[in-house]
Curated annotation (Swiss-Prot):
Annotated GO CC locations: host cell Golgi apparatus; host cell plasma membrane; membrane; viral envelope; virion membrane
Protein name, as recorded: Envelope glycoprotein L
Glycosylation sites: N170
Highest taxon in the source lineage: Viruses
Name of the gene this protein is made from: gL
Family recorded in the similarity comment: Belongs to the herpesviridae glycoprotein L (gL) family. Alphaherpesvirinae gL subfamily.
Organism name: Human herpesvirus 1 (strain KOS) (HHV-1)
Signal peptide: 1-22
Location, primary (coarse class): virion
Length: 224
């Protein structure tokens, strides 16, 4: 699968949900970025506490063919990954672990090398990104998401929040937004509660009416 195909599967919103308690919702759909410096000056996204879940949402609309830059912020604790559309002047924060997994797969594709120099460069890039990902194992969990959990869920605790939408409730939180208030979405912290997980149960087998029960066929007697 090509890199754009992998990018198409990556979610670009971040939801922070503290299971069972009121918490704050952080969504990073996009940010105004007229030039590279607008991206580089954004602070790193801080790692959540151990009991805090992060979920990424798919954007409503984005043309991946128009992406002009991909930024892997090596100095950030979570390896912040940003896609930049120069024409639209927007930057999208994406799930770094899903993105890097697809990127490394593309780099290791045997059909890529065209010459010795390209092969050496590609292998060096693969090694560098692989080391960056391995050094951040504490920031991600590779445990598969159980059935009934939200798709593309990245969570250190792998808490299953079900398929219900997270609705706002009254509450406060001491955390601050992960992006400055000039984010184009104008996002403000919203208290959330985690809905109970959806547990799939099978319906009991309906009882068959006595009148519909199959009758045993009696053998016919034959006269000799």
């Amino acid at each position: 699968m090509g890199i754009l195909g992998w990018v198409g599967l990556i979610a670009v919103g971040v939801l922070c949900v503290r299971g069972g308690l009121s918490s704050t919702e952080y969504v990073i759909r996009s940010r105004v970025a007229r030039e590279v410096g607008d991206i580089l000056k954004v602070p790193c996204v801080p790692l959540p506490s151990d009991d805090l879940d992060w979920r990424y949402e798919t954007p409503s609309a984005i043309n991946y063919a128009l992406i002009d830059g991909i930024f892997l912020r090596y100095h950030c604790p979570g390896l912040d990954t940003v896609l930049w559309d120069r024409h639209a002047q927007k930057a999208y924060w994406v799930n770094p672990f899903l993105f890097v997994a697809g990127f490394l797969e593309d780099l290791s594709h045997p059909a890529f090398p065209a010459n010795t120099q390209e092969t050496e460069t590609r292998l060096a890039l693969y090694k560098e990104i692989r080391q960056a990902l391995d050094s951040r194992k504490q920031a991600a969990s590779h445990t598969p998401v159980k059935a009934g959990c939200v798709n593309f869920d990245y969570s250190r605790t792998r808490r299953c929040v079900g398929r219900q939408d997270l609705g706002p409730t009254n509450g406060t939180s001491g955390r601050t937004p992960v992006l400055p208030p000039d984010d184009e979405a104008g996002l403000q912290p919203k208290p959330l509660t985690t809905p109970p997980p959806i547990i799939a149960t099978s319906d009991p087998t309906p009882r068959r009416d006595a009148a519909t029960k199959s009758r045993r066929r009696r053998p016919h007697s034959r006269r000799l």
